[in-house]
Amino acid sequence: MREKYGERFARRVLTPLEWPGYLRTARPVLFLANRFAAKEAFSKAMGTGFRYPVTLQCISVVQERSGKPGFAFHPNLEKLVLSRGIVRHHLTISDEMSLACACVVLEAE
């Protein structure tokens, strides 16, 4: 994929927060697949799909201090999340060989 599309696809999927991890990883295609799967799972949990402000560039997949994956949101998306009463989110990402999947649970008050 990297050879075919260069960095163009990576720049569409990844935010500036995620870019350093992509440059460091030994498995860039799997890194992208995991990030895309997580963002898609979030968009589906929100019930919007990828529609502004729920876009690839407004969602960053980050690693919490504990090592657990989580999200960081663009301010406009954060506003939408809070307006829906969502107080916590949970993310799990799994990969096996060339497959990636993610599950997102959103908790509201």
Residue locations for each model-derived region?
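Core catalytic alpha/beta fold that binds nucleotide/phospho-ligands
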Residues: 1-109
